Amino acid sequence: MALTEGISELLLSKPVVLGLAACALLFLIGRAFEPTVDALEPPMLRPSIPIFGHFYSMMKDQEAFFKRLDKKYHMPIATVPILKYKMYAITDPILVQSAYCNKNLSFTPFAINGAQKVTGFDDDYHKVLMETNVLPEYFKSLYDGTTAQHIHQLNVTSLKHVSQHINSIQENGMTIDNTYLWLRNLMTVATCEALYGPDNPIRSDSLVEDIWTFETGLAYLFFHIFNSKTLQRTKEARRRIQLALGKWCTNMRQDDERVSAYIRNRVGILRNYGVEGQKLGDIEVGLIHVPTSNSIPTLFWFFMHVFTRPDVVEQMRAEVEHIVQRGPDETVTVNIDDILERCPLMISAYREASRLCNGFTCNRIVMEETTITDRHGRSYLLKKGSSVKMPAGVMHASQEVWGEDAAVFRADRFLDKGLTSEQAKLRRAALTPFGGGAHMCPGRNFATAEIYGFMTALLLGYNVEPVDGKWDAFKPPPMATCPQSTSVCKPEDEASVCGTRLIRRSGWEGAQWKFVSGKVTE
């Protein structure tokens, strides 16, 4: 009796009553703001905290938010209420491919809204975007600038910069204090050399650092409400890059074929719409991180997964040794096309590294009411105005798709035999590091060719060893969560990544590396 009275008094006490009332009110408000879901739409996953729960979790956990939802509910598609809006989260590979092929799902609204936040361009240019045909022409120019011939030229120019670096390594070798920062800085300049030509504005260590400060702060530019110090550093780095690009764009001649078509085409489109001088640099900054922020961390993880496994190194060396041409003057020529055609283990190992580190979240807006269909023939209704997110990291980690060892690097995974047609189809659909559909990354072949060429030279020409000789500590570092503003995870602590020592291999002491791609040579 006393216990019952005590409980009654507790429940009737003012703080408890107010707390219960607040919870009830929050619940009712949450239901009032909650978007309605049609019976044909994907089922709704309500947040544990009404209204703000999913939004807060997604901002805090980024791509890991979707992995947690998948682990808890394991649904192929779901409606996730974000504040008062609908977001469809798709994690089934076949549904994702159905969405990529659906013309009623568009990336363009994200491009317009995100571009102004990322670049900070003024309202006058935003008006040009909204009222002219510049955006479709701009997107088309990106694909026109990455046709096979243009990609071959990008490959050779970028790898020429790489070869100058590794050709300079003497017989006593080279010690690298931080493997990640070495690869990051080397390949950032190499990529920009290929894009911007002999007057490349991104050569100084300070501007390279600015590119990565800008890239790291992209999420803060999108929301402007978190961490003002990081936001301020990001804006300052962005401005320095914009000034360098603005000066370069002002002086760039439209007929200068030493500049990549990828850049010339899009600058030409903007000039046709009256954008000149510094404004070109202000806009160009919005894409400068694209060819670096994903391919370079991928190279790092590929490098670490391969060179920390001596057995994989030996297998890959045996494969690539047959595709190089050794000249009488110590020149060693690597043809990128031969790697693509004759080095299946190299390609498999790269895809495996990409699968493990890539957490790309693809965004679309539903422009008109439409449906997408899964492998069992079931269709789901998607309502106009809703957003769609397709987190590749969930598919890349799926044990259903990749097997029980999905979390483990296995260099030959993409050479697996004996898969059923259904398993093979699922794997093809599930690997989406470059997105898909009309907006698949136009520079994907450039990104992979850079990596294949560089790794071939390292495998054949150099022994890659831990600086201190401790092989047990020479391993891939812990991986950070992938932010939704980029696609590839970085090391959790970039500054503490292990060092590497490169020593020329016996028989390759004087090798001078050259690269060929298609009919393009250095």
Swiss-Prot record:
InterPro entries associated with the record: CYP450_monoxygenase_sec-met, Cyt_P450, Cyt_P450_CS, Cyt_P450_E_grp-IV, Cyt_P450_sf
Record's subcellular location: Membrane
Pathway in which this enzyme or protein is active: Secondary metabolite biosynthesis
Residues annotated for heme binding in this entry: 441
Protein family per UniProt: Belongs to the cytochrome P450 family.
Record's function text: Cytochrome P450 monooxygenase; part of the gene cluster that mediates the biosynthesis of the lipopeptide fusaristatin A. Fusaristatin A consists of a polyketide chain linked to three amino acid residues glutamine (Gln), dehydroalanine (dehydro-Ala), and beta-aminoisobutyric acid. The biosynthesis starts with formation of a linear polyketide chain by the highly reducing polyketide synthase PKS6. The gene cluster does not contain an acyl-CoA ligase or an acyl-transferase, and it is therefore predicted that the polyketide is transferred directly to the nonribosomal peptide synthetase NRPS7.
Entry protein name: Cytochrome P450 monooxygenase FGSG_08207
Organism of origin: Gibberella zeae (strain ATCC MYA-4620 / CBS 123657 / FGSC 9075 / NRRL 31084 / PH-1)
